[in-house]
Amino acid sequence: MPKSTDIKSILILGAGPIVIGQACEFDYSGAQACKALKEEGYKIILVNSNPATIMTDPCMADATYIEPIHWKIVKKIIQKEQPDALLPTMGGQTALNCALELNRRGILKKFNVKIIGATIDAINKAEDRKLFEDSMKKLNLKTAKCGIAHNIQEALLVLKNVGFPCIIRPSFTMGGHGGGIAYNQEEFEDICERGLKLSPTTELLIDESLIGWKEYEMEVVRDKNNNCIIVCSIENLDPMGIHTGDSITIAPAQTLSDKEYQIMRNASMSILREIGVETGGSNVQFAINPKNGRMIVIEMNPRVSRSSALASKATGFPIAKIAAKLAVGYTLDELANDITGINTTASFEPSIDYIVTKIPRFNFEKFLGCNDRLTTQMKSVGEVMAIGRTFQESIQKAICGLEIGSSGFDSKVSFADNKQDIIKIRHELKDAGAERIWYIGDAFRCGMSVNDVFELTSIDPWFLVQIQEIIQLEKKIIQKGFIGLDYNFFYFIKRKGFSDLRIAILTNKKEEEIRQLRYELNLHPVYKRIDTCSAEFSTETAYMYSTWEDECESHPTKNTKKIIVIGGGPNRIGQGIEFDYCCVHAAQALREDGFEAIMINCNPETVSTDYDISDRLYFEPITLENVLEIVRIENPKGVIIQYGGQTPLKLARQFEKEGIPIIGTNPDAIDKAEDRNRFQKIVTKLKLKQPLNATVLTLEEAHKKAIEIGYPIMVRPSYVLGGRAMEIVYEPCDLDNYFKKFLKNNHITPILLDQYLNYAIEVDVDAICDGEKVLIGGIMEHIEQAGVHSGDSACSLPAYTLTNKIQNKIREQVKKLAFALSVKGLMNVQFAIKNNEIYIIEVNPRAARTVPFVSKATGLALAKISVRVMYGKTLSEQGFCKEVIPSYFSVKEAVLPFDKFQGVDPILGPEMRSTGEVMGIGKNFSEAFSKAMLGSHTNMKKSGRVLLSVRDDDKNSIVNLAVKLQKFGFKIDATKGTSIALKKSGIMARLVNKVHEGRPHIQDRLKNGEYSYIVNTTSCHQGMKDSQLICRSALQYKVHYDTTVNGAFATVMALNEEPTENIISLQEIHKKINLIN
């Protein structure tokens, strides 16, 4: 059957900001859906609040709304655009929940909007735990012994039947949010209480414990004619009890018998039919008891998911694209397989002759004091995928791609004290953390058996034997040494996945020496293609991975206009989707201009690793070894390293040494900006200002320089991204503590000390330089004052308080710096403004995380303009010489994951901790900020009682804030010091006790629901513990809080606006742009 003709326009719901449990895999799926449906001639209307996504590029839809995904706003968009259909299956749990709310309120029926991709009944049957259990009973499929609860009393009744330990899962949440494993009554009540608050339907599923069972997933696609295919089977290496998003996963499943696989396959298809998923992709999860083979169904997602993205990249089968086309009436046999072309259709199940391994990436070091043990609530912030012919090759490649400084199965213990080492290893195996896979290696080094490790981990012995063999091989490499690396042995260990760097460490040599020997032996990898059919049919799509065999399928073209774009690797805090956005734009611009674009990346969640974004895709870890091999075979004109964040940048000098041409700003210019002494000379020569600063290597030097600069000071290591290990130090003892931590973590780079400019306004500027002219992309004013990391601070474009005079001075300084640093391409400059003086904080001659936001706010595709500059097309030739000053305001707001990490200090500081961002667009700053707050799920009420508790430095400012709050009708509470300051100005506030001052105290009042807003600022050690406790409690009870006075004033300004009142598409606002000379 052909596509549906009764539908002319389709509204697609995005997933909103990147959060733990819902990351950029939904940009990948949403972008695929937009492209697929647009090429079919449908009018596409898109709603998504995340500006860092490819799907929100104006070219992807006919009407793009960067608006909060809230039912009131979506209702207004439906009223305005009159879509015929709504596609909610591409935006994760956020989109599904919004669709359900629109249906519940009768909005879809009122405006005659048809849901496609999944019916409301199907969503409810899959998401509602009771309905799902009933559906499984109809199919005679077992589910875990469980019960449903809507309050604590019901939960306790369920507990009597289920017993301890038990697993608690809130309904309609993502990433296991709010859930957990309870081993006792206290834990049970605590998790249930939290879960009930987080479930939109106030519903919990309480399961019997399946800890230690094996976990599997099936990616299923079904069409309207009841044709079903299994795209991919996925096996979790980690057993049940660890969220699948935090598990190492393998595709295809390795330890299922054929009989088990067929039972699971048939069950998956039956589940889709029973639930009512008429078209599209779904993910079905199973558990098998390894002791008796009992199989149960865990859950299913009636939408594309994190696993769908992994399965798509693992097989080459574009699940989201196919699901979108099935949603409008096509059947699987009518859709061509893009990779094999006319040879096969989408009804052919993919067949793969390789092993794919996904390893999650964690950022626990950003959240000191958090529980870093892995449970049923997801905690990872990204992931890496690797492809090899064997599991051993695949997992070792994946480890190298993690960007954590690991070359393979590095040891985590010193082996200096064998007894203590074994105690540590046993603990890490039993109570899994982010590094368990390395401790398994150490367990085998200590002489533990496969059975010993299995008893502690419940990981299938097949995987353990594979890892044990790798450790045995390591011992053999050490025994043979460098001189024992003959051709046969070298080739053998490369086939097992050993990197040059790992071999170098084991033989006590430099990586360069190992590489040189390998070259002398003429040992190089070959490249195989991902083709969906195990090489049964030929393919023109160059989607490749490296392995160690005889035949190479890379077949590089003879095109002399080749440029390699190096991606950013796995998402982590400080380096996220924004850099992938830039890489995608680079590939698009190159292809538009007749270049052959070659992408290297290893992140399965991203758009850049879609096989049709570049001409050639190498799915490889971003290491020197891998890039050199690809350069050797492709012989490109050059490589682009400025778009993938710190990952490719740190290889710049080595690329230069190896003679690889770098497109754009050269490594020396990058070093000039990064090297403190070199940069200071440039600033001095240009007669510009910097905060007083110094570079030190020892604690003694640091104390001496700190006295010269004057406390407080900002302390950080050189060459880091995301403010890693950055702190504000107020006194000498803080400096001592910082160095203790720093040395403990084995940092060896120089330490940078900067004067901390208290109450300064921070400013970000994105610009492009072609060597002759500088294009100012945008001047962004931060809402939180300097001292809060730029990635965690909200910002406004255009600036909302800076004078034109200051902004013009900033423009001039950016231009001077661009020319002095010989920038060719993008650059980002950060300033601090204090008492009308401009101080340069830092310059980054590369793409910054603000590029997507500025591009959406101004209509200028900065990454594309810059890439063309980098390969020689001037700004004048492109027609971009004028800065764009929008007539509307755009605000970028950070989204923080503190609700996932209980017990963590939630006060913002110089180290970045946000996982994502949203954008609000409005006629003025207030409206834009109110939308950004709504998009980031800020629960800000417009009335009630406010708690004010601020540091001494803020007491003058707080009076004005209190006056404004009273005008809105808020009642004021204040702690003792703040109350005195308010009283002096004639403002009466109810005095409230801090926790240590007696009851009723702040926590009591929060628990009683007395507060709707909290302003709490602190400095040094003054009230630090109190402040942390206040903010943690505010998070727990869903009360909005600000930890800076500037942030509080912006919040009050936003109260003047109704964020759901006005909507406008990106296409409409870009027509209103004004240009200035």
Swiss-Prot record:
Secreted recorded as keyword:
no
Q: Name one GO molecular function term.
A: carbamoyl-phosphate synthase (ammonia) activity
User: Which InterPro entries has this protein been placed in?
Assistant: ATP-grasp (IPR011761), CarbamoylP_synth_lsu (IPR006275), CarbamoylP_synth_lsu_oligo (IPR005480), CarbamoylP_synth_lsu_oligo_sf (IPR036897), CbamoylP_synth_lsu-like_ATP-bd (IPR005479), CbamoylP_synth_lsu_CPSase_dom (IPR005483), MGS-like_dom (IPR011607), MGS-like_dom_sf (IPR036914)
Detail which positions bind Mn(2+) 4.
842, 844
Q: Where does ATP 1 bind?
A: 129, 169, 175-176, 208, 210, 215, 241-243, 285, 299
The entry's keywords = Amino-acid biosynthesis, Arginine biosynthesis, ATP-binding, Ligase, Magnesium, Manganese, Metal-binding, Nucleotide-binding, Pyrimidine biosynthesis, Repeat
Report the function annotation for this chain.
Answer: Large subunit of the glutamine-dependent carbamoyl phosphate synthetase (CPSase). CPSase catalyzes the formation of carbamoyl phosphate from the ammonia moiety of glutamine, carbonate, and phosphate donated by ATP, constituting the first step of 2 biosynthetic pathways, one leading to arginine and/or urea and the other to pyrimidine nucleotides.
The name under which this protein is listed is: Carbamoyl phosphate synthase large chain
Tell me what organism the protein belongs to. Buchnera aphidicola subsp. Schizaphis graminum (strain Sg)
